[in-house]
């Protein structure tokens, strides 16, 4: 059984109720049909019955719950709660109603906030900012969270690196140019996400164009400082930097460029220095190595809400639903 098949088996065993708010996108219905066929989750699709019927033509989504915000008896409760949560920001009943009726991501997040759903997956036709803004406004962050960030779970076929091709890449979707403290926080969160997803111990590489002082630049200094901060805060975590990509994952190169490192040559968590590098990096691996890329999945929000790439396929949505809502309940035994 492959890694993602194991994840799907976990999803079936502990089904969550997931909101899919993007009823205007055909991929939502293609994914929903597959999720329901595989019995991976209970689904809520937000939209009018007419819109859902038209959008899902030729697909079986009959087991999904269709919630029409205009007709749902709980809509007023969501309006009232949104006013309560955002009153200090000037939210009025009229504005709250307009917001949740015109933006189904807001509506879906309110369903999660009120306990009517376990989580939400969105972003196939909305930007990351538009997807995560309501989450940060309404759900807030987990206690103790230093920074909300995003990661991709990468599953690379026929790959000898990482844990048989399984990696976490962070941050590839949210923080543009993190400072050393933020980069350290991304590393900490990504390591914990890897541990929860796979049951394996993370080996974290702080990536750079330099390995152990081979280049001098302010960008390198940032990664060096982030590595120091993360190590001091997490002395038991296998984490090292700064490392070039080949030194991080190729054993022979790691032994040559960083012979004293416990991470070099065997990293399974790759932390990119900025969003440009991370976004380009995951897409290169996805497109050229034919990797499965699940995400960007958020770290640090108080409830499981996850973004999608606007270039995602229906199968990508299926994978994100399966992965996102099993990692919180995975046992500690290894899955890879």
Label every model-predicted segment.
Residues 16-27, 171-184, 214, 309-314:
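Short, glycine-rich nucleotide/cofactor-binding loops
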Residues 139-154, 189-192, 220-241, 289-302:
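Gly/Ser/Thr-rich active-site loops/lids in small-molecule metabolic enzymes
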Residues 155-179, 305, 313, 321, ...:
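A structural-propensity feature for long, helix-poor, extended segments
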Residues 1-126, 134, 186-205, 216-268, ...:
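Contiguous, glycine/small-aliphatic-enriched amphipathic segments in soluble metabolic enzymes
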Residues 149-158, 168-172, 273, 286, ...:
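Short beta-strand elements
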Residues 246-296:
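Active-site-adjacent loop and "lid" segments of alpha/beta metabolic enzymes
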Residues 326-332:
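Conserved small/polar residues in nucleotide/adenosyl-binding loops
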Residues 129-141, 282-289:
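Short Gly/Thr/Asp-enriched flexible loops that form oxyanion-binding sites at enzyme active sites
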């Amino acid at each position: 059984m492959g890694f993602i098949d194991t994840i799907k088996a976990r999803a079936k065993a502990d089904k969550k109720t997931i909101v899919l708010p993007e009823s205007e996108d055909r991929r939502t219905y293609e994914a929903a049909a597959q999720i329901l066929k595989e019995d991976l989750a209970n689904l809520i699709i937000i939209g009018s019955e007419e819109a859902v019927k038209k959008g899902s033509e030729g697909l079986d989504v009959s087991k999904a719950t269709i919630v029409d915000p205009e007709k749902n008896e709980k809509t007023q409760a969501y309006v009232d709660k949104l006013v309560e949560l955002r009153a200090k920001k000037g939210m009025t009943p009229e504005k709250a109603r307009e917001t949740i009726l015109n933006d189904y991501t807001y509506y879906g997040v309110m369903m999660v906030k009120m306990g009517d759903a376990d989580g939400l997956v969105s972003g196939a036709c909305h930007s990351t900012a538009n997807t995560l803004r309501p989450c940060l406004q309404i759900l807030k962050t987990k206690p103790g969270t230093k920074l909300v960030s995003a990661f991709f779970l990468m599953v690379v076929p026929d790959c000898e690196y990482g844990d048989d091709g399984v990696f976490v890449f962070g941050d590839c979707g949210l923080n543009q140019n993190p400072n050393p403290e933020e980069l350290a926080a991304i590393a900490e969160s990504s390591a914990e996400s890897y541990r929860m997803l796979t049951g394996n111990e993370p080996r974290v590489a702080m990536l750079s164009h330099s390995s152990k002082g081979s280049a001098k630049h302010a960008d390198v200094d940032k990664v060096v400082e982030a590595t120091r901060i993360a190590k001091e805060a997490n002395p038991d975590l296998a984490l090292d930097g700064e490392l070039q990509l080949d030194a991080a994952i190729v054993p022979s190169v790691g032994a040559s460029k960083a012979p004293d490192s416990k991470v070099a040559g065997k990293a399974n968590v790759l932390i990119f220095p900025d969003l440009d590098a991370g976004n380009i990096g995951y897409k290169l691996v996805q497109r050229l190595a034919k990797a499965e890329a699940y995400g960007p999945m958020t770290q640090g929000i108080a409830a499981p809400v996850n973004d999608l790439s606007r270039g995602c396929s229906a199968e990508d949505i299926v994978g994100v639903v399966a992965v996102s809502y099993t990692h919180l309940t995975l046992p500690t035994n290894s899955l890879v």
